[in-house]
Amino acid sequence: MKKIQIISDKNKKSQKIKSVLVSKFKTLDTIKSNIIIVIGGDGFMLQTLKKNKNLKKIFYGINSGNYGFLMNKFSSKNIIKNLSKAKMTTISPLEMIVKNNKNHVKKYLAINEVSILRQSRQAASLSINHGSKKIIKKLISDGVLVSTPAGSTAYNLSVHGPILSLNSQKLSISPISPFRPRRWKG
């Protein structure tokens, strides 16, 4: 039998699902469990993954939010079967290294996306490299968003970026209010 911990959002629907699961399973703390059931929406799942990013655990999401791109439907009758039949997906964090015009370097880690935004009323002038390859020579916009497949249905979708399959090995690079090149959607 799997050793389970349940983490849920605070909304009523999540709490109701949690109470059903707690009545069916003996739950453990994070250290003793080997699977963590996360009840909420995609945002809550991403928060939970980020908060627990150093754990080598399996996370199983149950949707009590809206879209549920990262989550599974809840069925109290089939929960054990659903857990055993679930497809495993590895979500790798995105590392962004940024160097500004004063050569200050910062590193960021994200599960869903990273964004670079203008800091004043003036548009940002950006170039985008992937390793040594220049992808975009000059982008004039309010900023740019680099999204992983896990984040492609959030902010990325709002800026007209593509939805990526969760198993995709791609990243979405989407401009935020681009001025040049015009009509580029990512």
Predicted features and spans:
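Catalytic core of DAGKc-family lipid kinases
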Residues: Y67-G143
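Short glycine-rich anion-binding loops that position phosphate/pyrophosphate groups of nucleotides
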Residues: G41-F44, G65-Y67, A150-T153
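A residue-level signal for conserved active-site and pocket-lining positions in enzyme catalytic cores
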Residues: I37, N63, V114
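Solvent-exposed alpha-helices and their adjacent loops that cap or buttress functional pockets
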Residues: L28-I31, M88, K107-Y108, R118-R121, ...
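Short, acidic/small-residue loops that bind anionic groups at enzyme active sites
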Residues: L55-M71
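Gly/Ser/Thr-rich active-site loops/lids in small-molecule metabolic enzymes
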Residues: L145-R182
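Short, well-ordered beta-strand core segments
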Residues: I36, F59, V144-L145
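ATP/NTP phosphate-donor binding region
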Residues: M1-I35, I39, F44-L55, F74-T90, ...
